[in-house]
C-alpha cells in the first residue's frame, strides 16, 4: 500500500515548499479516520508501481473498485486489436469526474483540447460524409439529383397542391429553407468552441442567452454531480415575517406580555436535563433557556455517520439568543396588539357612527311624537273647554266626530296608542246622552243609526271582541253602546207588548249590523225571550182571536233556535184544543199549517199521528160509498190534509178505512149485470181523486190493480145470460192503458234517478280534493237547495251550531246531531235531508 497520503498536509494537499521532504507526523485526517472502516483507500496504479514517488498520478479522478478490470465502454465503435504492439494503458483509461472536489470548476479552466476522445476504428472503417458534417457544400444544389430522373417526386407534390417557393401543408406552414448545419472547429465536445448557431438560426430565433445565464446554468448542472463529504457550509436561509403576516396570524407562539397572574400553584418536576429541576408554576417553564446543558449533545444532533467527519459544536450564546428572541417576540406582540387596538378603534368608530344615526332617527321620531302629542293635547283641551256649561260656543256631536276623525287621520299612531275609553267617556258620552234623550225606539227605529255607525269606526278597536269575552274597559264603542244606548232599549222593552211584535222586530233589524253581537244576544236572551215565554204561557188557542204564529214567527230570523223552548208548550196547548175537533172544521188546518216548517219533522209527524190522523180515520170510517148517489164531503175533509200529514199515514188511512169498502161495492156492482161503461167511469173518477204522489205508492197501486183484475174476471166469466157488447174489449183496453201508465211512470222515475246519479258521479269525479264531513253536508245542501249556515255566537259543548233548512244541527267527529225536544239525537245524512225538506 502506498504512503502517498502521508505527504499531504492537514487538508490533504501536498506542500509545494517542501517537495523533497517527507512528513511522517499524524495529521487530523488520520485521527478522524482512525476507526472509520469506510475511510477512503488509495489503490496503487501501474504507473506508481513503476515510477514510485515520481509518478504523475491523479488519484481524485480514480475510484476504487472490487474488480481488477475496468468496465468496458460499449458505446464506442468496434475496435479490432492488431497483432502488433498494444497501445499503452494511459491512452485506454478514461477520466472520470471526482466527487470530492471542493471548489467549482469554471468552463474557462478546461484545456483547449478538452472534449470527447477520437473514435477508435480499425483499418476497415472510414468516416463517412465528411463533406456533409462540415457543412462545406452549398444548399443551392438541393434536389439536383432529380436531373437524372423523370422528376416524379416534384410532379406528385405539384398534384397535391405544392407550389414551388412555398412551404408544405394546407396553409403553407412548412419551412422553405432546409436546416443548415455548422461544422465544429475541432474535435471537442458540444459547446467547447463557443456558440454553434448558424445565420439561419439567428434569423429565425433572435433570442440570445447571455453569458451570465449560460455560466449560471452550467454551474447548476455541474453542481448536481458533486458530493461534499465534509459537509461544506451552506448559505444560511433567513425567514422574514412581514407586518401583514403577523396581522393575519393574530397571535404569538409565547405569551411574553406583561407579567401575568400565575396560572396555578402546581409543583412541576423537569427531568429533561442532566439534573432534576423543580418549578412551582407552569409559567416558570416558559422562562427556561432553550439551550442544552454542558457536555450533553443536542437532541437534534445525531452521532456522526461512519466515514463522515464529525462537525465541531457551533458557537452558542444562550443569553444573547434568549434576549434576541425575547425582543423579537415583544416586537411581534406589540405589532399584533397595535393592530388589534387599531381594528378595535375602527370598529368602535363604525359602531358609534351607527349609534349616532340611530339616536338621530330616534331623536327625530321623538320630536315628531312630541309635536303630534302637543297638537292632540291642544285639540282635547279645546273640546273640554267647549264642554263647560259657561261656554258660549258649546261643542256638538257632529263637531266632536270631526275632531276625532282628524285625530284618526292625521295622528293615527297617537290616537291608536291613546286611552280612547277615557277620552270617549269624558267627551262623547255626555253628548251622546243628550242626543238620545227624547228618542222612542218603537216609533222611530232608525233614529241615530248613522251617528252610531260613524262613531263605531272611530272608537271600535281593530280586534273584534267575541261573544262571551267582552271587556268594556278595552273597547270604547262597546262601552258607549252598553252605557248610553242600552238603557233606552231596556226602558222600551219593559213597556212593549209581545203580540205587537212588528215595531220591535223592525227596530232590532235596523240595529243588528251596528251594535256588537254580544249586546244583541243580551237583548234577545234577557229581554225579548222572557216576554215571549210569558206570553206563550198565557195564550189560549180556543179563546184568542190572534193566531200565535203571527207574533212568534217574525222572531225566527233573529232568534232561530232560541225559540225552541217555546215549541213544546205550544204543541201541548194545540193538542188540548184538538181533543174535540172534527175534520169538518178547517180552522185547525189554518192554525197548524204555519208550524209545519217550524217544528222538526219528527215532532211534527208525532203531533199529526197523535191528534189529526185518528180524527181523519174516524171520518173515513163514516164515509158511505154509493155509486148511484155519492156524498164526497168526508172524503174531501180527509184528502185536504194530504200536505199536512205524511204520505205513509194517508195511505194507511186509505188501506184501513177506504179501499175495503170501495172494493166490496165494486164486486157487488159487477155481480148484478152492470153497465161496464159506468163502472169504467166510476173507477176512473175515484182514481182521479188522488194525487200522483199517492197513486205512486205501491199499496195504492196494488189496490187499483186489484180492482182491474176483478173487472177482468167479471167480463171473462160466463156467469149470466146476457153480456154487454164490447164490455170485454173495453175492460181489456182500460187494463192495458192503466198498466202502461204505471210502466211509463216507473220508467220516468228510474230515468230521473239515473240522471241524478250520473250528475252526482260527475260532481264527485270533478272534485279531486278530498272533503271532510262538513263539506259533504254543504254539497248536499246545495244539491237539494237547502240553506246551510252557522249560527252566530251559538255553541253546544264547544261545537259550532248550524242551521240546515229549518232544523239546528252540530257536527262531532263525522256524526250529525239534530236538536230534538229534550236532547240532541244523531241521524244519518239522508234522514237529515228528508227532515229539512
Swiss-Prot record:
Cross-referenced PANTHER family: TUFTELIN-INTERACTING PROTEIN 11, TUFTELIN-INTERACTING PROTEIN 11-RELATED
GO cellular component annotations of the record: cytoplasm; spliceosomal complex; U2-type post-mRNA release spliceosomal complex
InterPro entries per UniProt: G_patch_dom, GCFC_dom, STIP/TFIP11_N, TFP11, TFP11/STIP/Ntr1
G-patch domain boundaries: 149-195
Positions of region (Required for interaction with DHX15): 1-50
Superkingdom of the organism of origin: Eukaryota
Pfam family membership, one: GCFC
Native organism: Canis lupus familiaris
Segments of skewed composition (Basic and acidic residues): 1-13, 54-64, 103-116, 217-231
Major location category of this protein: cytoplasm
Renumbered residue ranges of the record's region Required for nuclear speckle localization: 710-734
Function, as annotated: Involved in pre-mRNA splicing, specifically in spliceosome disassembly during late-stage splicing events. Intron turnover seems to proceed through reactions in two lariat-intron associated complexes termed Intron Large (IL) and Intron Small (IS). In cooperation with DHX15 seems to mediate the transition of the U2, U5 and U6 snRNP-containing IL complex to the snRNP-free IS complex leading to efficient debranching and turnover of excised introns. May play a role in the differentiation of ameloblasts and odontoblasts or in the forming of the enamel extracellular matrix.
Residues of the signal peptide: none
SMART domains: G_patch
Composition bias, Acidic residues: 14-28, 91-102
Any one GO molecular-function label of the UniProt entry: nucleic acid binding
Name of this protein: Tuftelin-interacting protein 11
Phosphoserine, modified sites: 2, 59, 98, 144, 210
Localization per record: Cytoplasm; Nucleus
Family statement drawn from the similarity comment of this UniProt entry: Belongs to the TFP11/STIP family.
Keywords from the named record: Biomineralization, Cytoplasm, mRNA processing, mRNA splicing, Nucleus, Phosphoprotein, Spliceosome
